[in-house]
Amino acid sequence: MRTAIIAALIAVTGTLCMAETTPLAEPGYELAYGESAEFAFTPTGQYGSVRLVYDVRMQFPRAAGSTYVMAWEVNGKPLNAAATRTSVRLLNKPLQFTMASGLEIGWAQGNTWRAVYSPDFELVQGTGAGGMQVEQVDPYRFVIDITDMVTRGEENTITLLHRGRVMDLKRAFPDMDPTLELVFRELAFDLSDEPTAITGLVDDADEFSADRVMLQRPATCDIGGVASVAGSGGLSIRLPDLDLRVSSRFSWEGGGFNGFAADERGAQPEWVVRKDTGDEDGATIVGTARDYRVERTVRFVDDHVAIEDRLVNTTDRDIGLAFDNRLEPVGSEVLQAYLCGNPDPAMVSLRGFENPTVFVRGNEAGCGLVALDDVYRIQAEMYWEDGAGIRSDVFCLPAGGEYTVEWAIYPITRPDYFDFINIVREDLDVNFTIPGQFQFGLPSAADMTPEAIRTMIEERDLAVFSTGTWANTGGDPPYYHGAQSLEAEHLHERFRRACENLRAVAPEVASLIYIHTFINLHEDTPERFPDSLITNADGTPYINPGYTSRIGMPFYYCYPALDNSYFDAMKRLVDLCLDDDEIGADGIYWDEVEMISPKRSYDRWDGYSAELDDEHRIARKFGDPHLLSLDAKVALVEHIRSKGGTLIGNSCPRTRTMQDMHFPRFVETAREWYPARAHLYSPISLGDHKTVSDFDTLLDDIRLKLMWGTVYYYYSRPAHPYPTITRHMFPFTPVELHRGWVLGEERLLTAVPGTFSLGDDDPVTVCWYDADGALADHVGEERVEGGKRLVRLDLAEGEMAVIERR
């Protein structure tokens, strides 16, 4: 909502002998919850850099942490905390900070910046803030270099949005009525004599045009020509204008790290590396330490390097064994790095997400690294520290045990992240068919007329209609989850009636019932499922604090395992949903398959996870809920399929085992970059319910998801004045993902202009949607060249199109 527009029309002349600070607003300026403001200024004269300077807090009666609540733009472009991996905009403090509680977080994500909850400009820096204290840096003050985003001698604009309403921040404080306005002690810009910190800019904005031919198979290379294995066990990758060293390190108890092509200063005296074999197809390297052995097999496979590290515990005790594999530039500059598909140069670490990759790019080439095996993917932390890598800080091995870590390196002769992703997708065999459009709201079909059901289906080309969470509106309890859902008999009947009504009108549309295999809302959950509880380190049951506070009942978490009682309850829940004499639905919508709030359970060990102390010894073992439940989840998928059930999931796979089950899964998109989490599986983004409020914002969301290389599933369901592009989105069998367009076997969808092809000369139909989302009377220009039908689409801003096989 842009209701607060403030014009600060200022012309300032700076000199090289002194810095000039000019207010954009008066001291004490406040921006109300959910509002936005615009400030205009004109820098003139001689200066070295232009800086946005401010002190800010979000009004709150106590220290309560911080959140990404401010969205800044300069001249309509997002203001991020860094321009490239080597050009940081935030000048007065590091990109990351640590609270007194030990939590390490960043000051910005994309163009959204943190503000601390505080009643004044002192509390958060002092001990009175408790675990929320930020002691090492000033949490209120920000100095940001915007030189490259500003035009000298012309009017420039800075825009600020308070994202509180979009985030629904007040919902987090149900027993209070906080105002949450942003309060500025200072809001100004500096013309400084200091030179700008921004150099080596990367133009990530593709030059889209109708005449650009979008035939872009991945720019692979002959791996033997660019990769070599060193005697130290590491690898060298030599690409145009991008030389990289691939190094690995493995912790040892009581000290530092042993390594392959890594810094040897922290290695054990006993650490010995030998290269057993090596030829044009790869090599075998063995590293021997006091407590373990690393047997590395390197294979050159066409366009990539496949690496297996067999880790063997040679002792009769459990050992900690953190490990790290990374890409380091050697005499080259990495201009951009993607972590989990996120290109934000201010992001230095990500963990717990589904896209276990890092990708670095120079001017002419790029290189990616991907974790492959189950444990590596679950434990992976993707990071940037003068190089990009994937590490595990929690890996351990049982006495006499072993485990094989698998990963791969993909050099690309074009600096294109999507080239890397498309090759990996082929190798992972994840280009399976997404059958059709999905939507929540199935219970409403219990009360809808046949005509209303048919209109809705045709308008959105629905193939799947699903219930959401089992909301018991106005009842007690207010929600049902997990095994507790077996007792919601009145909802069973409503769901059954909805399925029957849908089937009578559109038997081709699948009815799905929501399940969650971790959350359970029985008040006596600990007594019902003592063998299945996710527990805290002190042995108490984990209870989600946010849900518990908001809903008013304890949100316990259990996990299914083949040998525990919760798995049996989940099978009974599936039977209830699918059996003809029960609800009788066509399938299951499985929420949060691999994305839940508790990351650890201390009730049992998964065999490979432990908290390690500063000397890499095991401090406490734990079980990752997704490793503990892995076999049971596979069995549950097989149980659903044995009943003929359709299956769709929320969150993409975080293990190769679940990846190979091949059923459509989407990712939620509360942050702009979240569609990238789906890049290594079914590339489906669920709509952002926080920003989609009407048909226009729905169209914006669909375009945004296409810009991230994904197709679209509905979350919010605003009224449609007419059918739009989602009607022609499925079925979709992915072939290639790109920025702004996606290619499938059946169709191509684009939000950018270009000359496109489905790869052959088959006849096609073009569905062209104007900026208002309506089907337009345009078909593009067609020609056939080299056996390929090319379709020129001169899309204007906001337009989208589909090219379908006839």
Task: Name what the model sees in each region.
Residues 20-208:
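Beta-strand-rich recognition domains
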Residues 203, 410-489, 500, 507:
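An acidic-aromatic substrate-binding cleft motif
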Residues 197-248, 255-290, 294, 298-380:
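Polysaccharide-binding surfaces and accessory modules of carbohydrate-active proteins
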